[in-house]
Amino acid sequence: MEKEMLVLGKLKEGKFEKFMGFMQSEEGMAERKKIANPEKTVAAVTPDKSAVMFKIFAHNEEALKAFLNGSNPVSKPIFDEVMESYQIYDLSKVNS
């Protein structure tokens, strides 16, 4: 079952291009597909490129945590270089 989540990432100075290069690479896409459906992902970046936000539809929350916290051997080297910090939020729809 997919779960709507929001991931906020603060990037180290000047590392946006390196981060996005990995996220869009074959290797990065393969890892992202283990976590969520990339086709449904909604992404945003701050004007100064110091932070990114992704609304994802996760199907493997543990893989998401591993992808971000350094326990995934594929993402660890790049995230050690580019990621300053991150936060993960569960999203729930509010009926009006």
Report the location of each language-model feature:
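Short S/T/G/P-rich N-terminal loop/turn motif that feeds into the first structured element of a domain
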Residues: 1-76, 80-96
